[in-house]
């Protein structure tokens, strides 16, 4: 099968679409990737790519074709320019780079922005190939939830764009079943929607058992009960509520909060830690490669996932949930809806309502006071549930089957 994968983000940027490409290639399919130049998350072109672009033209047996784009940089205007520059160059150069090639199917990984799908719509008609779209963020809902767009007129325009894109897709894969109503509202074709959740990355196949040493960065925290947050530090993660919980437990000397990651609101979080005088219990450890996350998780008493109290966020399962489950550590959830349901259904930890700093503090105290055997049992249930519900091999086999079925219908 000849598959074109289109994604604004791709290796060496860390996204699960990388594993889709490597697995399809390993299963004998001819995969071509059309993507941009790597600049996420720092917003600057990767130095290694800048020095030797040719070294990034092949990945796991797949050919990688890259188009220019404006790096994300800092600030809203540069982000908008980044989004639209990919649309422009992928639409302009994509057909030229792919001239003379035919494909059995086109697969698009659509984390934000939804605009990145537009070149695929064009290529679908040029190549006469079916288009499969993996929806990881719901637009326009996400834009209003994080406060990026407040104008109803502009949100309605984005909604029309989303409807246009969905109607040109042959199959729409939703990362959460909670996405179905919104997708079907804009597509007006419920028969096209399928459930395709995220999974734990291959880096977590090693587990975090006793034979795995903790990260060296945790040596000063090894005798404490550590609440660890790992991932993007953004508006959606509601760090004011997390710091509210930390402030409520500021006098609990055995409890520490470790933040592993970076993001657009990281400077504001650092300032808040200083302002609230939480430097003795809240520590920002910076961003580290995904490959090192198991050794960081090894030193965690519990792994924290949070989302703001917005209706749209109650529909999503944050990608870190699957990684946390695979780590075999208790989970702490300060979120509503689908993400909370997974934790409760798995018996993998404790949850409180989104935005509830007091509730999170209470959950932390409950976990800290539990016996280690009880917490270990939570971790085992987490791993078992993750393997049952989010098995990587099964899910990648499913997307392969959908691509093959779509190709036969053309």
Where does each model-flagged region fall?
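A charged, aromatic-enriched C-terminal amphipathic alpha-helix characteristic of glycosyltransferases
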Residues: 355, 359, 372-403
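Conserved donor-binding/catalytic core segment of Leloir-type glycosyltransferases
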Residues: 200, 215-237, 243-246, 258
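Nucleotide-activated donor-binding/catalytic signature segment of Leloir-type glycosyltransferases, i.e.
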Residues: 253, 258-260, 267-294
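Carbohydrate-associated surface elements
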Residues: 37, 178, 198-199
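Membrane-proximal helix-turn-helix segments that form the acceptor-binding/catalytic region
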Residues: 115, 122-126, 152-172
């Amino acid at each position: 099968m000849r598959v074109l994968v289109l994604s604004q983000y791709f290796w060496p940027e860390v996204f699960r679409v990388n594993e889709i490409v490597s697995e399809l290639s390993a299963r004998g399919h001819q995969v071509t990737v059309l993507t941009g130049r790597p600049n996420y998350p720092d917003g600057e072109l990767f130095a290694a790519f800048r020095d030797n672009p040719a070294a990034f033209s092949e990945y796991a047996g797949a050919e990688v074709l890259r188009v220019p784009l404006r790096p994300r940089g800092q600030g809203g205007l540069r982000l908008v320019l980044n989004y639209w520059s990919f649309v422009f160059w992928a639409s302009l150069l994509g057909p030229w780079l792919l001239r003379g090639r035919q494909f059995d199917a086109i697969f698009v990984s659509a984390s934000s922005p939804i605009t990145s799908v537009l070149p695929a719509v064009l290529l679908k008609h040029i190549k006469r190939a079916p288009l499969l779209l993996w929806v990881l963020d719901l637009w326009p809902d996400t834009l209003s939830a994080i406060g990026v767009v407040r104008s109803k007129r502009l949100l309605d325009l984005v909604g029309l764009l989303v409807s246009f894109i969905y109607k040109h897709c042959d199959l729409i894969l939703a990362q959460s079943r909670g996405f179905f109503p919104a997708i079907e509202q804009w597509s007006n074709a419920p028969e096209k929607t399928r459930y395709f959740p995220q999974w734990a990355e291959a880096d977590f196949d090693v587990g975090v058992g006793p034979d795995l040493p903790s990260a060296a960065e945790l040596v000063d925290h090894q005798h404490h009960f550590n609440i660890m947050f790992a991932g993007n530090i953004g508006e959606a993660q509601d760090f004011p509520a997390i710091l509210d919980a930390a402030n409520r437990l500021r006098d609990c000397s055995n409890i520490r909060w470790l933040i592993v990651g970076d993001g657009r609101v990281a400077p504001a979080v650092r300032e808040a830690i200083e302002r609230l005088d939480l430097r003795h219990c809240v520590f920002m450890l910076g961003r580290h490669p995904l490959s090192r996350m198991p050794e960081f998780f090894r030193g965690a008493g519990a792994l924290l996932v949070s989302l703001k109290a917005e209706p749209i966020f109650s529909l999503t399962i944050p990608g870190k949930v699957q990684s946390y489950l695979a780590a075999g550590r208790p989970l702490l959830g300060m979120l509503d809806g689908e993400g909370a349901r997974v934790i409760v259904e798995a018996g993998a930890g404790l949850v409180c309502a989104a935005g509830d700093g007091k509730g999170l503090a209470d959950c932390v105290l409950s976990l800290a006071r539990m016996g280690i055997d009880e917490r270990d049992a939570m971790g085992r249930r987490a791993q078992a549930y993750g393997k049952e519900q989010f098995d990587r091999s099964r899910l990648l086999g499913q997307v392969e089957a959908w691509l093959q079925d779509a190709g036969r219908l053309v």
